Curated annotation (Swiss-Prot):
Underlying gene: ORF7
GO cellular component annotations of the record: membrane
Originating species: Penicillium roqueforti (strain FM164)
Gene3D superfamilies: 2.40.160.20
Primary role: Part of the gene cluster that mediates the biosynthesis of PR-toxin, a bicyclic sesquiterpene belonging to the eremophilane class and acting as a mycotoxin. The first step of the pathway is catalyzed by the aristolochene synthase which performs the cyclization of trans,trans-farnesyl diphosphate (FPP) to the bicyclic sesquiterpene aristolochene. Following the formation of aristolochene, the non-oxygenated aristolochene is converted to the trioxygenated intermediate eremofortin B, via 7-epi-neopetasone.
The entry's keywords: Membrane, Transmembrane, Transmembrane helix
Record membrane topology: Single-pass membrane protein
Name assigned to this protein: PR-toxin biosynthesis cluster protein 7
Stretches that traverse the bilayer: 24-43
Annotated compartments: Membrane
Organism domain of life: Eukaryota
Record lineage: Eukaryota, Fungi, Dikarya, Ascomycota, Pezizomycotina
Length: 186
């Protein structure tokens, strides 16, 4: 067996910076396209938070004196494409408004959710349907955030990845909750 070579460059790391939750409305199924079945899932609300203080080695200047607390406003949505009833290609667009400031945060994301028995149980409303824990489903999103907030301007340049869990309430997939991680290269 050949020895593995060690990469001389430092490896990037993920640092927990916050959380986001989307409250989901009733899904509308569209037709089949060459890339998959189109559906629309309205986002009716939720919340977005960041930690404070920011982790060591963060590297982006922040004027924040507290963690962000923001409300996800109704009117956004997820516009996924479903591939072969096995995979959802996620495409989210929402707006949040700061609760501890009056600034607006435009949040977009894309990602993947591989469907497994837990998700099929939720969609079929079976007796086994339940909320998932982090890591039980292969679901992730990459976020882009735009804001006019000087305190949270660092979000405009942050490379953010979300690890997802699904919340089952009232006999349906009612919410999606994500831990947010900043991708740091040093």
């Amino acid at each position: 067996m050949e020895p593995q070579t060690k990469d001389p460059d430092p490896l990037p790391r993920l640092v927990h910076i916050g959380e986001i939750q989307f409250n989901l409305g009733e899904v509308t199924t569209g037709g089949v396209t060459p890339r998959g079945t189109f559906i629309f899932c309205p986002i009716t609300g939720g919340h977005f938070t960041t930690v404070f203080p920011l982790p060591d080695g963060f590297g982006i200047h922040s004027e924040a004196i507290e963690g962000l607390r923001a409300e996800v406003l109704p009117g956004g949505g997820d516009y996924p494409l479903i591939h072969n009833n096995e995979l959802a290609e996620l495409n989210v667009s929402v707006v949040a408004k700061g609760l501890n400031n009056d600034h607006i945060f435009r949040i977009t994301s894309f990602g993947i959710c591989e469907w497994n028995k837990l998700i099929f149980d939720m969609m079929g409303q079976t007796a086994a349907a339940r909320s998932t824990e982090m890591g039980e489903i292969n679901a992730w999103q990459v976020f882009r955030i735009n804001t006019d907030s000087p305190e949270y301007a660092w979000l405009n340049w942050a490379c953010i990845i979300g690890q997802e869990r699904l919340i089952y309430e009232d006999s349906r997939m009612a919410k999606t909750h994500m831990k947010l991680f900043q991708f740091l290269v040093k």
